[in-house]
Regions:
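Transmembrane beta-barrel domains of Gram-negative outer membranes and organellar outer membranes
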Residues: 1-164
Length: 164
């Protein structure tokens, strides 16, 4: 079982819109293997506050997602991650749902440090791409940072995950 907390900020200059997000996720991987395939699922909740500096517009989006997870891990510690799921976003009195997907790869750089690369997206949108680092502070407690681009914007992410 893993619990994760994430924070994101995305500021666009044209139009001048700021997004501030906070999220929480629970991951359960009942089929685990040190090498080869592992499989599980993830449930996520997120909130994004949107502020448009050009107008007095401000609102909050809420998002719920359910994702199937598959990982293929090599003996070298490298891992390929494949995800597919569905999300629902509620904002300004409306609700929309979309299929989601992701593919990622991680490389061990040191005993507790990994480089990460991922491409992810959702139905009807172009993919986002990100590069990052994940560091295991103590056994089971990981912090991560990533920066990326996609859909005409640049973004950064900071996260923390606790495996228990």
């Amino acid at each position: 079982m893993e619990a994760a907390l994430g924070r994101a900020k995305d500021k666009q200059y044209e139009p001048a819109t700021t997004y501030r997000g906070l999220g929480f996720g629970l991951k359960w991987v009942p089929l685990q293997s040190d090498t080869g395939w592992s499989a599980g699922g993830r449930l996520d909740w997120g909130r994004t506050r949107v502020r448009d500096d050009a107008t007095p517009g401000r609102w909050t989006e809420r998002e719920f997602a359910l994702t199937a997870l598959a990982t293929y891990r090599l003996a070298s510690g490298q891992a390929l991650h494949l995800n597919a799921g569905r999300k629902v976003v509620k904002a300004q009195g409306t609700s929309q749902s979309a299929a989601t997907w992701a593919a990622g790869y991680e490389w061990p750089l040191a005993q507790q440090l990994q480089a990460t690369a991922e491409v992810y997206g959702e139905q009807r949108l172009r993919p986002d791409k990100a590069l990052g680092l994940r560091y295991e502070m103590v056994e089971g407690l990981k912090v991560s940072v990533a920066a990326g681009r996609g859909n005409g914007r640049t973004f950064g992410q900071v996260g923390m995950a606790w495996e228990f």
